[in-house]
Amino acid sequence: MNFYLDNNIVIVNFNNSLKDDFFIFFNNIYKEITDKNIIIDFGEKNIFSSSFLDKLINISTSHQNLNLSFVIVSSILNSESIPQSLVWSPTLKEAKDLIEMDEMQRDLGL
């Protein structure tokens, strides 16, 4: 796994790691990125068990409570297979667009 900064967005790439390793890695870097919008790119990995999604929901909710965006990218998910409390996109470009829209809404006080 790795992460990089793209403007005001941190993009975390989930490579071929084990899904349990993801949360260890993410928890280790989170204090460095807590003030940024976050995209987690899972690509085509099928790792979305209910317990994995529950952990993502907890992270997402906490991050959104800081008035920041948290989006996951997965090309294998669809809107019916993911809880509504998670912001999801099939592509990285769309995830960036979602964050841009979130920022506009925050700027307008919506």
Placement of each model-derived feature along the sequence:
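Flexible, charged surface loops at secondary-structure boundaries
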Residues: 4-6, 31-35, 63-65
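Conserved beta-strand segments of the P-loop GTPase G domain that flank and frequently precede/overlap
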Residues: 12-14, 38-43, 72-73
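Short aromatic-glycine-(Arg/Gly/Cys) micro-motifs in beta-strand/loop hairpins
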Residues: 60-82
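Short, glycine-/small-residue-enriched flexible loop/hinge segments at domain edges that mediate gating
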Residues: 23-53
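STAS-typified acidic loop motif
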Residues: 1-27, 44
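Short acidic-hydrophobic, aromatic-tinged amphipathic segments that line or gate anion-handling sites
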Residues: 87-95
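Charged helix-capping and loop-helix junction motifs
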Residues: 53-59
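A charged, well-structured terminal subsegment
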Residues: 94-110
